[in-house]
Every structure is written in structure tokens, then in C-alpha cells.
Amino acid sequence: MAPDLALADRPEVRASLDIVSAWVESQRAYSGLPGASLAIVHDQTVVWAAGFGWADVERRRPATAETRYRIASITKTFTATAILQLRDAGRLQLDDSLARHLPWFSIAGKHADAPPITIRHLLTHTSGLPREAAFPYWTDFDFPTAERLREGLARQESILATETQWKYSNLALALAGDVVEAASGEPYARYVQNHILDPLGMKDTRVLAPDPDDPGLARAYGRRMPDGSRGPAPHVDTRGISAAANMTTSVTDLARFAMLQFRDGPAGGAQILRGSTLREMQRVHWLEPDWQAGWGLGFRILRAGGKTSFGHGGSLPGYRTQLRIWPAEKLAVIAMTNADDGDPLTMVERAQQYVGPPIAKAIAKATAKDDKRAPDPAWRRYVGRYRSRWGDAQVLLGDDSLLLIDPSLPDPMLMVIRLQPVEGQAHTFRADAKDGYASHGEAVVFELDAGGRATRVRVGQNYLDAVESW
């Protein structure tokens, strides 16, 4: 899926994308993260998608925007989508008891007066069920079959009464997958393929566990240990809890699912759910006591900085993934990593923080006169990475100036320096920084070699040398 070049080429958007790219690559390199892939979606277009580092370190196979990752619990959002399709088709109701569709379901409990577990409870994680089925599969990675999972219910009991507390449960969503099968008459994987993936054109997405030797799949790695070592992570098939955590996809393919969330109108074709049902899934159905977070139908909903977002994260051995959507801005960010210590949530939050406002600004200016001075194309010769013994810096082309950032910082925009050209002085700029420690007002001078390439930069009285990579 090609990025939306018209929006990505707007100076303010391009500058913010360069910052995201520089920050992600720096964070990846300093943390030793093998690889990562990200995509940013606005409404029905992919604004930007890229890979960083390695899909397979040993084979030197780069991570790209098309690299596939195990998305683990993001699978739950597809299971919820299937449930709502079946609800809209009249095959079930959200407040149906679980036992109505799964007559074999029974679990002990000490809450005799509690309402029976319903399908809605499964999707909102308010069923009170245990987090997992009755097996230690996160220890030995021997996931039970659906049959063994059902047999194991006889050894389990509900932890809480229904509707008393939000309690995340893989078991609940595994049972929701069983409901999909019972209500549709199709195996879960076939239903998702035929009714969700195919209509959305998600050709690179797999419902069942992938072949570990698939050349398009990112290799899974464990966390980095105190001695700096990082070994491979085990390949797993989640079997009986597949409806909770088994799918595989790329950031560009998952972008198609993100685009669905912004659509409206009746169901049909790629509109696999009517707009009103999508809104129903995306609104709060269970609110946390702090009123800052809640749960929709399959989606985690957060409120921060005056903005509401929804989405889901995923975690399987060797993979950490995140899908986050800001409906008011029609913005979605997807991040996938191939190690146990990846931090895709911070990646999506930073990307939204840096790119969201410029996209909104670019759209607002699309039909208005833009009097801002465009950056001089000759400034591209200064763009690059620089290093001193004290730290790193990256020079980027902004919307009307050069930007100098330290991409190794957790939030480099807190220390950004804008470089304004000094008239009549070649290769010379003036530092414009809000932080008084950051050489504000001093000269920034680039030195070039005979070929016109920047070799170092003087900031104030001290130098950083140009480097090819971190």
C-alpha cells in the first residue's frame, strides 16, 4: 500500500516524519532492539510506513514496512469485529448468555447472585473469568487445544462476579472465538479470513500460526540480558486461545483494518461493519474508576492530554506490537517490534505527538494561502547525523528552518533547536532554542568538504563530526 505522498510531502509533515524516523532508529540502536516497523494512517491513506533495523539479525535481512510480525492480542479486535458482524446479522445478541451459544460451558464460582456471563462481558473483560486457561502455557509454551481448554474449565472457577471489576482475560476471548464458530457454523480462522481479511484486502495477514521459516516473518528475539546478550525467542502456536492471540500481519496490512475504523455508512464490500456499529465498538462500555481509561467492545480506550484514543497491544514470545487510533483526528499509528523488550506503545505515542498536529495543520492549510517561507533546498547538504564524545545530534529539514535534535533522548522535541540562516554568511545559522542550556542565540556553522558534503558542525564553540550511522 503506497503512502499518501501529497500529505507526506507537506513541509510540516515531512519534517515531523523525519523526526520520528530519526528518533525510532536512535532508540532502536541504543537499546539494541533488533527491528521495528511503523505506519501512520490518516483516514483512508497511509501517510508513512518504514522499517528499522533487522527482521533477522543473523541473516542481515532488514525490517521493512512489509515485514510480518505476530500481533498477539491485537487478534482480539478481529474476534470482536466478528462478533459484531454476527450480531448485526441477527445470529446473536451481545447480552446473550455464553451458555446459550456454548451449552458445554460451565465454570465453578462463589458468586451465586452474579448475573450470568454474557458475550458483552467477554468483549469488555468484565466476565470475572481467570486470565488464562488451566495450563502454564506462558511458561512451557505448550498451548492447549480447544478440546483441552474446555476440559480444563472443570478445574477452574470464576475469580470475580460479573460486572464488578475490569479483569483482562485471554480465556474470555478464546471463548468468544468459540461463539464465532457456534453462531456462524464456520471454523474461526475461516470465518475471519472470509468475512474480515478478504473483504479488507489484507493479503499479508494470517489467522493461524505462521511457518517460523517464512522469509517474510520477523525472527523473534528475547529480551536483552544484563550482559548484553539476546537469544532467540520460542516459536509458539496458541492453538486453543487463537482467537485471543495468534494472528500475523504487517504494519501496512494492519493499516487497512485501521482505515476501516474511520468509515461510515452501511455494511457492504470493504465496509465490513456499518458505521454505527464501528462507533459502538469504539465507545466506552466499561469505565475505570480513575475515568482515564476504559474498555469498548474489543478495544482499550484511553483519555490523555484532552484526547481520546482506542486500540490494543500485543505480546507473544519475541514480539511486541501496538495499534492506536485517535478518532477525532482520524489518525492511527501502528508499531511492531521483534523482541521481548520492544516498546511499541511509546513509539506510537511519540509518533502521534510529533506527526498528529502537523497533519492537522497541513489539512487546515490545504485550501488557505500559505505565506510561510519554504526551506531552501540547498540546506539538504547539512542534513545528517553528527557525534561528539558528549552525545549525538541529528540535523533535519524542517518546514521553514533546519532542526537540530538529540534523537537519543526519550522526547527529543523537548530540546529541539531551530537553525535560522544568517544572511550573508555561508553555511551559518543562528540557534533558536527554548531551552537556555541549548546554545540559544549562538552561531551554528557547517564545514563542507570539496565535494560539498558536511563533515562537521560547530555549535557555539564546540564541534560534532558527521557520521554515517549510529
Label each residue range with its predicted role:
Residues 54-57, 317, 340-342, 410, ...:
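A short acidic/small-residue loop/turn micro-motif
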Residues 10-71, 93, 104-108, 146, ...:
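Short, conserved catalytic-motif segment at the N-terminal edge
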Residues 54-56, 110-325:
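Short, surface-exposed loop or secondary-structure junction motifs
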Residues 21-24, 44, 68-95, 173-181, ...:
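Active-site SXXK
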Residues 311-312, 322-339, 457-459:
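Short, well-ordered beta-strand elements
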Residues 2-9:
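Acidic/histidine-rich, surface-exposed loop or edge segments in extracytoplasmic proteins
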Residues 32-35, 317-320, 391:
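Short, small/polar residue-rich loop motifs at catalytic or cofactor-binding pockets
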Residues 307, 328, 345-470:
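Peripheral terminal and inter-domain segments
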